Amino acid sequence: MQTRNAFSWIKKEITRSISVLLMIYIITRAPISNAYPIFAQQGYENPREATGRIVCANCHLANKPVDIEVPQAILPDTVFEAVVRIPYDMQVKQVLANGKKGALNVGAVLILPEGFELAPPDRLSPEIKEKIGNLSFQSYRPTKKNIIVIGPVPGKKYSEITFPILSPDPATKRDVYFLKYPIYVGGTRGRGQIYPDGSKSNNNVYNATATGVVNKKIRKEKGGYEITIVDGSDGREVIDIIPPGPELLVSEGESIKLDQPLTSNPNVGGFGQGDAEIVLQDPLRVQGLLLFLASIILAQIFLVLKKKQFEKVQLSEMNF
């Protein structure tokens, strides 16, 4: 009987320990994983909506600039660089998930035309490899090699990101043509304000959920605040929880209104999107253009020679 009780107690303790560890993992892991741009693909088949808006803007609410530079034209089956610049003030610090201040990270999504894709390592020149460094690029989906995602990576080191791109060859891909194609880019700096599941991060403004008077504000042991608002109309108490990070703006006894900001806006980052155009050039057209230019130059040379010959004939006739 005692042995059975001992086994039962051990079983309960093991189950309880596993449950606690699982809860700790879920609580601590979720905010970190959701911060990666690649996790945005869980809710969107395509990162660019029909309106042209890139879905990263759903989580990164502030509007910031981004720039992309690509060659004007490129030949088939050629590796070229798409340089994405994500500028921001290197001196600013962002609010981390634990409420402390830290350096900003950056991320980007590059939407290429169908057929264009990330260049394989064996096609990269030493110069491009040096520019890429230790960056690790990923496809938005295994079936969408033309959409490339990177980040988050340290912003101080990678505010300029070089994407090595391989152009397609219409000779081997029938759905690719020698045309002018658009390229779209989205770039983030800093953490988002909304997680992909719709919940707010601590990198956000927190507003009052009721109109009334701030009756009590309690600073939590691990950071953040618990704000008690007493509704003046019915005396009902409403408690607003402020996570670590945002700076509290209200004090006890202060009258506030519904949706009034309780905290400052800690966000120093944001998202921007841009576009560029690139021409997939037919080598035969280039050769034809070169031959045409060469023929014009030769024609000019022959014209000059003919003119000089004519002048000599005229001069000789005048001497007679």
Curated annotation (Swiss-Prot):
The keyword Transcription regulation does not apply. GO terms for cellular component: chloroplast thylakoid membrane. Residues 1-35 form the signal peptide. Keywords: Chloroplast, Electron transport, Heme, Iron, Membrane, Metal-binding, Photosynthesis, Plastid, Signal, Thylakoid, Transmembrane, Transmembrane helix, Transport. Pfam families: Apocytochr_F_C (PF01333), Apocytochr_F_N (PF16639). Heme binds at Y36, C56, C59, H60. It is a single-pass membrane protein. It is found in: Plastid, Chloroplast thylakoid membrane. One of its GO terms (molecular function) is heme binding. SUPFAM superfamilies: Cytochrome f subunit of the cytochrome b6f complex, transmembrane anchor, Cytochrome f, large domain, Rudiment single hybrid motif. The chain crosses the membrane at residues 286-305. Binds 1 heme group covalently. Its main location: plastid. Its cofactor is heme. One of its GO terms (biological process) is photosynthesis. The 4 large subunits of the cytochrome b6-f complex are cytochrome b6, subunit IV (17 kDa polypeptide, petD), cytochrome f and the Rieske protein, while the 4 small subunits are PetG, PetL, PetM and PetN. The complex functions as a dimer. Belongs to the cytochrome f family. Component of the cytochrome b6-f complex, which mediates electron transfer between photosystem II (PSII) and photosystem I (PSI), cyclic electron flow around PSI, and state transitions. This is Cytochrome f.
